[in-house]
């Protein structure tokens, strides 16, 4: 599989803006069209840096909403490897331990790679790997309520810790890094991941790129 046979689509935006939902929808619908072995999804947060050398007290202070928290260089290397026809081993990150685990997820080359993450559009080298990009333009207050429910239910967080993180890092980093990166998106999607028209437009773009 050469680079022209691998289409990379990026879905960016605030935490809990609907990125995973639209990525899941596109993945499932493209699987029906192309086959389940031809589509792959990579979550940017798998590439949070390993912090095994730090104490737990130090790890919990990590600003997950700053670009420096992510190993975008490794993500770029993995995307290029997939385009070159080589499999990659994607890291697995633990939010309870605040570091990478010893596990890896093997991903083989695909016709379509869907990236989803909050800071994808902030990195020029990463943008160069993309064939099309989307920014989920969901109101920040809605994102916060979704994030609060998710982190308490799925990530073992307390309501107080989620609220503190939001005011100290999530909102400031959104305004400093994530929202300005919207200018680099090819498609801006309002109303979250259930925007059917935006989903259809993105699918049509993917099909067009595959037909080249």
From Swiss-Prot:
One term under GO cellular component: cytoplasm
Chief site of localization: cytoplasm
Pathway it works in: Pyrimidine metabolism; CTP biosynthesis via salvage pathway; CTP from cytidine: step 1/3; Pyrimidine metabolism; UMP biosynthesis via salvage pathway; UMP from uridine: step 1/1
Compartments, as annotated in UniProt: Cytoplasm
One Pfam assignment: PRK
Residues at which ATP binds: 13-20
Keyword field: ATP-binding, Cytoplasm, Kinase, Nucleotide-binding, Transferase
Keyword Transcription: no
Entries under InterPro entries matching the protein: P-loop_NTPase, PRK/URK, Uridine_kinase, Uridine_kinase-like
GO MF entries: ATP binding; cytidine kinase activity; uridine kinase activity
GO terms, biological process: CTP salvage; UMP salvage
Coiled coil stretches, renumbered: none
Catalytic activity field: uridine + ATP = UMP + ADP + H(+); cytidine + ATP = CMP + ADP + H(+)
E.C. numbers: 2.7.1.48
Family: Belongs to the uridine kinase family.
Protein name, per record: Uridine kinase
Gene: udk
């Amino acid at each position: 599989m050469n680079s022209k046979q691998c289409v990379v689509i990026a879905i960016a935006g605030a935490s809990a803006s609907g990125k995973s939902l639209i990525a899941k929808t596109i993945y499932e619908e493209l699987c029906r069209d192309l086959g389940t072995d031809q589509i792959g999804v990579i979550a940017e947060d798998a590439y949070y840096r390993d912090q095994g050398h730090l104490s737990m007290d130090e790890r919990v202070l990590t600003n997950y909403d700053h670009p420096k928290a992510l190993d975008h260089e490794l993500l770029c290397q993995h995307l290029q490897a997939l385009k070159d026809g080589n499999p990659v081993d994607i890291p697995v990150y633990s939010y309870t331990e605040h570091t990478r685990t010893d596990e890896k997820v093997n991903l083989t080359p695909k016709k379509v790679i869907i990236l989803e993450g909050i800071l994808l559009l902030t990195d020029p080298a990463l943008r160069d790997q993309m064939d099309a990009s989307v920014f989920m333009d969901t109101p920040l207050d809605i994102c916060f309520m979704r994030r609060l429910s998710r982190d308490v239910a799925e990530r073992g967080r307390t309501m107080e810790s989620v609220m503190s993180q939001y005011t100290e890092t999530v909102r400031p980093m959104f305004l400093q890094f994530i929202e300005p990166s919207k200018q680099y998106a090819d498609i801006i999607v309002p109303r979250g991941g259930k925007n059917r028209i935006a989903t259809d437009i993105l699918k049509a773009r993917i099909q067009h790129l595959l037909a080249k």
